A protein has these predicted regions:
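Long, charge-rich, low-complexity alpha-helical segments
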Residues: 36-131
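Membrane-embedded catalytic scaffold of the fatty acid hydroxylase/desaturase
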Residues: 169-320
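Membrane-interfacial helical/loop segments at transmembrane boundaries in membrane proteins
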Residues: 160-164, 353-378, 450-451
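Internal/C-terminal transmembrane anchor helices
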Residues: 417-447
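Long, low-complexity, charged/polar intrinsically disordered regions in eukaryotic proteins
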Residues: 1-35
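Core alpha-helical transmembrane segments of integral membrane proteins
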Residues: 106-208, 249-252
């Protein structure tokens, strides 16, 4: 045993053993462990069995004997020592070790950044418990039926022309639509928390962060991985389900007040629901697809799936998936790679022009705010300020995405060329050529003008 680890070995404080991933799309389902910092870790069955037998009192020989019985094959004390010191300890799962060593954490592609908490885990649990009865099947059936009736009346009988005329002519109404949309988004997150709680898991905090270039709300529902497929899908769909409930509440308010602003908010919420169901970025649709196939992080499977396609008989990580899951993920990869390549490629190619337009919008918003305040048009000033803030945030987000992509590419090249100076030199020269070509493209297309 390493002298830095506690002996007899024991798990670090706050480590939870969650068991095997249920309804997994892997040929050999991984086991799940959650650290005290909330990081969810997938490990093999062998590592999980060793972790289960570590209790702070057993010596290596005793652990080896118990794990051997669990596995049905012999495991020596030295092999257990290797698993503990070389596999479990680096993941931060054992007490002792380097006291202040940075724990490894996931850094998924296109993840939410700059997170801030709106509701702590305790409050999110209370909200989940409060709204939990809304997931009883009779309630779900009633909500969906009422939603269908509402949509038929709104889009087929009543229409939205009156709502557009009222809202576009009054900045106060526009502000009200924006405020109601924010409330709808927060209620959406309560739906995820309630779905998680209904299945028997514990939701974490509800907060807000930056996704790509725009602000986005989130709910920590990592504990739902202890649930089966149905429980995880309930958690995923809880957000759009609560959007539907929110729209029914707005329709009821319209029946009392006849305020057209409420109808336009209902229409906008429909668009938000459709956006959430897109499976190509980390919206609800992405997690729905992920839980349908039983693979937690689809973006992490892009490389293995491509490796399987071009392996020419070699064993790859893509073969760890069951055939139905592999087929579904392959179809998803074939759709998402061109979309992301086009989107992120366009961002890089037109980054200066994009940011110049955004900062012109920020500047114009500043003038509008000053003029509206001088004219005592405070609602219009608030709208202009919100628009300017969103433009500035989009600019900062676009630069952040570009920098992050560059850093990930540099890290990948560094790892692939480690110990190979010739290949690294070629990679560096290639990077210089690409950077110079990009700057030349910007210059030729006049993207530096006006700065």
């Amino acid at each position: 045993m390493s002298t830095g680890l506690a002996y007899p070995p024991r798990l670090a404080d706050g480590v939870e053993l969650l068991g095997e991933l249920k309804d997994s799309g892997f040929t050999k389902p991984p086991a799940l462990i959650r650290r005290a910092d909330g990081q969810m870790i997938q490990i093999s069955r062998l590592l999980y069995l060793v972790a289960c037998r570590i209790d702070g009192t057993r010596a290596l020989d005793a652990i080896a004997a118990l794990v051997s019985g669990d596995l049905g094959r012999s495991l020596s004390a030295s092999q257990v020592s290797y698993v503990i010191t070389d596999k479990l300890a680096p993941l931060g799962l054992l007490a002792g070790g380097a006291a202040k060593a940075a724990l490894p954490t996931a850094s998924p592609l296109l993840a939410l950044r700059a997170r801030a908490t709106l509701l702590p885990a305790a409050a999110a649990n209370v909200a989940g418990a409060l709204f939990r009865p809304l997931f009883h099947w009779p309630v779900i059936a009633a909500v969906i039926t009422a939603g269908g009736i509402m949509d038929y009346w709104l889009f087929m009988l009543h229409g939205l022309s009156g709502a557009y005329r009222q809202v576009l002519g009054d900045p106060v109404d526009l502000l009200l639509v924006a405020a109601l949309s924010v409330v709808s988004a927060v209620f959406h997150e309560c739906g995820h928390a309630a779905g998680c709680r209904y299945g028997g898991a514990r939701p974490g905090r509800i907060g807000v962060g930056i996704y790509l270039v725009w602000p986005s709300f989130f709910t920590d529902v990592t504990d739902s991985y202890r649930l089966g497929r149905a429980g995880r899908l309930r958690t995923d769909l809880g957000g759009v389900y609560f959007n539907l409930i929110f729209m029914l509440g707005l329709a009821a308010c319209y029946a009392v007040t006849a305020n057209q602003v409420l109808l336009l908010t209902i229409a906008i919420t429909h668009l938000e629901m459709l956006e959430q169901l897109l499976p190509f970025v980390r919206f609800d649709g992405y997690f729905i697809l992920s839980d349908l196939v039983g693979v937690p992080d689809l973006f992490a499977r892009i490389g293995p799936v491509l490796g399987t396609a071009f392996a020419r008989g070699r064993h790859t990580r893509g073969e760890m998936l069951r055939r139905p899951a592999r087929r579904m993920i392959t179809a998803w990869v074939l759709c998402v790679i061109p979309l992301l390549a086009f989107t992120l490629g366009s961002l890089l190619l037109y980054l200066p022009a994009f940011n110049r337009s955004l900062w012109l919008s920020v500047n114009n918003a500043g003038h509008l705010v000053a003029g509206d305040i001088a004219g005592r048009q405070y609602a219009a000033a608030a709208l202009a300020a919100i628009g300017g803030a969103l433009a500035a945030l989009s600019s900062a987000g676009s630069v952040y995405v570009a920098v992050r992509l560059t850093r990930r590419a540099a890290g990948l090249v560094s790892r692939r060329t480690a110990g190979q100076p010739r290949r690294r030199l070629i990679a560096v020269l290639g990077a210089i050529v690409c950077a110079a070509s990009l700057v030349l493209f910007w210059a030729v297309h006049g993207q530096f003008r006006g700065w």
